[in-house]
């Protein structure tokens, strides 16, 4: 079965939307997490969050913390929500953290390799995706998991995300 599912729920670029849209998206996020956290737990799904959580409103962070706590011991599907995330942000953040370790003398430049970079990515500890499904008729990856998608199969569909069903997954 599927062990990991990553959803690109809110990109760093979404912060540039009009304020009323951002507020609406944050309310949708909080309501969805509040409504679904217990269902995730009952279905043995473990929730993870990647991205710049400091950018989220406090009420959203608090709701996410509760859901993470509720599902922390679950051993089934790993559901990874990318919130306030972009691939460029992730790579820049990883490079900055590696540079900081070099500056502190904890890491030698000569020892930096692909494994080092992967350790500093938000997805450290998760396998690279095997399949990326892009819905809504878009034909781009939109700054999502730029490093991790290197060898993934890419599937594009006109089906909108809210309408995406099990049959669509099998088709992919």
Residue ranges and their predicted role:
Residues 1-172:
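Flexible, compositionally biased loop and terminal segments
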């Amino acid at each position: 079965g599927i062990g990991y599912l990553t959803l690109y729920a809110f990109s760093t670029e979404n912060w540039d939307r009009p304020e009323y849209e951002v507020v609406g998206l944050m309310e949708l996020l909080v309501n969805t997490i509040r409504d679904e956290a217990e269902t995730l737990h009952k279905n043995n799904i473990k929730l993870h969050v990647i991205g710049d959580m400091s950018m989220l409103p406090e009420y959203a962070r608090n709701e996410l913390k509760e859901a993470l706590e509720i599902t922390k011991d679950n051993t089934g599907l790993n559901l990874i929500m990318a919130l306030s995330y972009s691939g460029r942000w992730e790579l820049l953040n990883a490079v900055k953290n590696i540079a900081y370790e070099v500056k502190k003398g904890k890491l030698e430049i000569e020892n930096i390799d692909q494994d080092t970079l992967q350790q500093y990515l938000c997805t450290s500890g998760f396998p690279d995706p095997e399949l990326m499904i892009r819905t809504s008729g878009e034909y781009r990856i939109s700054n999502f998991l730029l490093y991790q998608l290197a060898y993934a199969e890419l599937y594009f569909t006109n089906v909108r995300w809210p309408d995406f069903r099990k049959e669509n997954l099998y088709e992919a």
